[in-house]
């Protein structure tokens, strides 16, 4: 079952269970997928699961950015809504590696390729993106990689 099919199935189950939070969030996900499909017409046949994963990650990132803004504005009601949406979206994402696992992976790649300069950061990020898309927080990778390459 593809990720898109799983989202559709969960959407239908949420409607049956009358879970309004899940329904609204899954509608949002389906809409984002449809928008992406429309923007790729003629360029690509259909969205792959990895395309959908990156889309879901961007949706989570948007929500986290919104939470920061809502915290500054002291809007706890909106923060709770965003957190609930993140929980639903994350059901479709693979488990993210923690900071220690991420650091170990980056150290290994740096040692294997003898990266010593910040100029090689792009190559490092490319390797990580190719091998760990969806499993690793790229924002965290950037911070850790900068600290390790400078050492």
Labelled PLM ranges:
Residues 80-133:
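Strongly charged, low-complexity linkers/loops
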């Amino acid at each position: 079952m593809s990720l898109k099919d799983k989202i559709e199935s969960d959407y239908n189950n949420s409607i049956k269970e009358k879970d309004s939070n899940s329904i609204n969030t899954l509608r949002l996900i389906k809409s984002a997928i449809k928008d992406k499909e429309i923007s790729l017409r003629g360029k690509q046949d259909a969205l792959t699961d990895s395309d959908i994963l990156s889309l879901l990650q961007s949706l989570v990132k948007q929500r986290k950015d919104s939470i920061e803004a809502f915290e500054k504005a002291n809007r706890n009601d909106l923060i709770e809504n965003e957190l609930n949406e993140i929980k639903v979206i994350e059901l479709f994402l693979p488990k993210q590696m923690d900071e220690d696992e991420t650091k170990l992976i980056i150290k290994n790649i740096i040692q294997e390729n003898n990266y010593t300069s910040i100029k090689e950061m792009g190559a490092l990020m490319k390797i990580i993106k190719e091998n760990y898309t969806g499993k690793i927080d790229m924002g965290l990778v950037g911070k850790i990689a900068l600290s390790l390459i400078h050492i």
